[in-house]
C-alpha cells in the first residue's frame, strides 16, 4: 500500500508514475473522499470546541448557583452530533482504505518504461541452448514413460493437475531438496516450514487481497457461534497459499523487530495453489501452468537502504540454481507495464525450453519496498529508536515443476532416457540416467 501522504502532497505526480505501468488512478474519486473527510473532521473539531466551551460555562453557572439545564441540553445534543460525525468519518476512512488497497506500487526509477512483456529488457544470458541430432520431444511425451501421469491428475482433480510416480517423482523431490540445500548452505537463508492455509489478514498483508481474490482457492471454515450473531454460525475465509511468500513475509506482520535482526532471510519449499483465472486456453499441455505446483521461495526482510542490493543478490541466488544444473537461461528486468501489483522492481529469469524453442519464466524476484510492510505494519527500530517500515523482497528459487520440465527436455537422449545433471546425482543415490519403462 502506498503512503497516503504521497497522494495528499502531489497526486498528479503519483498518477503520472502509475500511468507508466498502465494504471489509471481515480484522482477525482480520491479528491472527493478527501474533501468529505476534511469537512467531517472540521465539523467535528468545531463541535468539540463548542462542547468544551459550553462545559466550562456549566461549571461557571453551577458555581454561581444558576440554572445550567439549557446549556447541559445543548452539550448533550452536541454529543449526539459527534457520534454521528464519528460514524460518518469511519465510512469515509473505510472507502479511502479500500481505494488505497487497490492502488499498485510505484515503479523504481531504474525500471524501463513499457506497455507489456515485449518491452522487458534483457540484462544477461548464460549458457548455450543445445543442438540436438534427433527429433526433440516435449516433457509430456518424455515424461509418459518416466512416471508423469496427466490422465490420473485429471481423474482425481480435473484439468491442470498432474500425478508424478516413480523416477520422475524422485527427480522432483531431489530438485526441491537440492534447491533448499543450496539456498541454506551456500546463500545464507534460514529454512522454514510454513502453513499451506492462511487467514485473510495474511493475504491482505502481501497484497493478494482484496484485488486478486478470484485467483485464490478459498477455504471457508465454520468458527462456531458468537453472541453478536445470534443463532448464526460464524464462517471465516481461509486461503490455500499461492506462494510461500505469503506466510514467510507475514511472519513480521504487526511486529517491531530489532534492527540487528535484519536482514531476515527465509527459504521454504511448499506447494502453491492458483486458480489461474483468466488463463483459459494458455499452456493447456503439460506442467507449465498448473493449479498446484511446488516452489522453493526466498523472502528477505531488510532495512530500506539495503533493499536494492538485496534484490540483485536474491536474483543471483536464483540464477545459481540454473548455473549448477547447467541449464541455459536469460534474465530480464520487467518494464513498468509488466510488473506485478506490489513490486517496485522485478527481474524474471527464463529457462530454455527446447520443445518450445524459447525461454520461459522459471523465477520472478521482486523488491516490494515498503508496500507490503505498510499493509502489514511490519517495522524495525531505526538508529534513533523510532519505528520505521521494513522493506520486503521475494523470489522463486525456483519453481520446481518448471525446472523439472526444463531438465527433462534439455537433458533428453535419443532413446527417451534423460541424463541426470551432475549436481543432482547425490540426491538420487548416484543415478546418472533416468531410463523409460519398457
Curated annotation (Swiss-Prot):
EC identifiers of the protein: 6.1.1.11
GO cellular component, as recorded: cytoplasm
Record localization: Cytoplasm
Molecular functions (GO terms): ATP binding; serine-tRNA ligase activity
GO biological process: selenocysteine biosynthetic process; seryl-tRNA aminoacylation
Family membership noted in the UniProt record: Belongs to the class-II aminoacyl-tRNA synthetase family. Type-1 seryl-tRNA synthetase subfamily.
Protein name: Serine--tRNA ligase
Protein's organism: Ralstonia pickettii (strain 12J)
Amino acid at each position: 500500500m502506498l503512503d497516503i501522504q504521497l497522494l495528499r502532497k502531489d497526486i498528479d505526480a503519483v498518477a503520472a508514475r502509475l500511468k507508466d505501468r498502465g494504471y489509471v488512478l481515480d484522482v477525482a474519486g480520491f479528491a472527493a473522499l478527501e474533501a468529505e473527510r476534511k469537512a467531517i473532521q472540521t465539523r467535528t473539531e468545531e463541535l468539540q470546541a463548542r462542547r468544551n466551551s459550553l462545559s466550562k460555562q456549566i461549571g461557571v453557572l453551577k458555581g454561581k448557583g444558576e440554572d445550567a439545564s439549557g446549556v447541559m441540553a445543548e452539550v448533550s445534543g452536541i454529543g449526539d452530533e459527534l457520534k454521528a460525525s464519528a460514524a460518518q468519518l469511519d465510512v469515509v476512512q473505510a472507502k479511502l482504505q479500500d481505494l488505497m488497497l487497490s492502488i499498485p506500487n510505484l515503479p523504481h526509477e531504474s525500471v524501463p518504461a513499457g506497455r507489456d512483456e515485449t518491452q522487458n529488457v534483457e540484462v544477461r544470458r548464460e549458457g548455450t541452448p543445445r543442438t540436438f541430432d534427433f527429433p526433440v520431444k516435449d516433457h509430456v511425451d518424455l515424461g509418459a514413460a518416466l512416471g508423469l501421469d496427466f490422465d490420473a491428475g485429471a481423474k482425481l482433480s480435473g484439468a491442470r493437475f498432474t500425478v508424478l510416480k516413480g523416477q520422475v517423482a524422485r527427480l522432483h523431490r531431489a530438485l526441491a531438496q537440492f534447491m533448499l540445500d543450496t539456498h541454506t548452505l551456500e546463500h545464507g537463508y534460514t529454512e522454514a516450514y510454513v502453513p499451506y492455509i492462511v487467514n485473510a489478514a495474511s493475504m491482505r498483508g502481501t497484497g493478494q487481497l482484496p484485488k486478486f481474490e478470484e485467483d485464490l482457492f478459498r477455504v471457508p471454515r465454520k468458527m462456531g457461534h458468537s453472541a453478536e450473531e445470534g443463532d448464526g454460525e460464524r464462517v471465516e475465509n481461509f486461503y490455500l497459499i499461492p506462494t510461500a511468500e505469503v506466510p514467510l513475509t507475514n511472519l513480521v506482520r504487526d511486529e517491531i523487530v530489532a534492527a540487528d535482526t535484519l536482514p531476515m532471510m527465509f527459504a521454504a519449499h511448499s506447494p502453491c495453489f492458483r486458480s489461474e483465472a483468466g488463463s483459459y486456453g494458455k499452456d493447456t499441455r503439460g506442467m507449465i501452468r498448473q493449479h498446484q505446483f511446488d516452489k522453493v521461495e526466498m523472502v528477505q526482510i531488510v532495512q530500506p537502504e539495503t533493499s536494492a542490493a538485496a534484490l540483485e543478490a536474491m536474483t543471483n541466488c536464483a540464477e545459481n540454481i540454473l548455473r549448477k544444473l547447467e541449464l541455459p537461461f536469460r534474465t530480464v528486468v520487467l518494464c513498468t507495464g509488466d510488473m506485478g501489483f506490489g513490486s517496485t522492481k522485478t527481474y524474471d529469469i527464463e529457462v530454455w525450453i527446447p520443445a518450445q524453442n524459447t525461454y520461459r519464466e522459471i523465477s520472478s524476484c521482486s523488491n516490494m519496498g515498503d508496500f507490503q510492510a505498510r499493509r502489514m505494519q511490519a517495522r524495525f527500530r531505526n538508529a534513533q529508536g523510532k519505528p520505521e517500515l521494513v522493506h520486503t523482497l521475494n523470489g522463486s528459487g525456483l519453481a520446481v515443476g518448471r525446472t523439472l520440465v526444463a531438465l527433462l527436455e534439455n537433458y533428453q537422449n535419443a532413446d527417451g532416457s534423460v541424463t541426470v545433471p551432475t549436481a543432482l546425482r547425490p540426491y538420487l543415490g548416484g543415478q546418472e540416467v533416468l531410463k523409460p519403462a519398457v
